[in-house]
């Protein structure tokens, strides 16, 4: 299952287990955040209703981007200014989309084996 979420003025296509870099979100590394602004969700070619759907993600790290140099110059006026800027980012790992966890598939196989063992 995939979803399109909006955070920090940008849109991201995410699925369970993906890692994305977004604009800075409040929180410590290891904490869980919920991305509630889901624009689209689907499975393969089918689209699902996004009403009340949330995307759960874990904060992996708070980081800074590459340094961007801002250089201003006015020729023939001996005017030069050099400033640097590093944008703050948050690295997220998507845990689940709409309550559907990635780990739910493994217990389903265990439940299927249990009735087979009971019949034998």
Swiss-Prot record:
GO terms for biological process: translation. One of its GO terms (molecular function) is rRNA binding. SUPFAM superfamilies: L21p-like. Keywords: Ribonucleoprotein, Ribosomal protein, RNA-binding, rRNA-binding. Coiled coil: none annotated. The keyword Methyltransferase does not apply. InterPro entries: bL21-like, bL21-like_sf, Ribosomal_bL21. GO terms for cellular component: cytoplasm; ribonucleoprotein complex; ribosome. The keyword RNA-binding applies. This protein binds to 23S rRNA in the presence of protein L20. Part of the 50S ribosomal subunit. Contacts protein L20. Belongs to the bacterial ribosomal protein bL21 family. This is Large ribosomal subunit protein bL21. The gene is rplU.
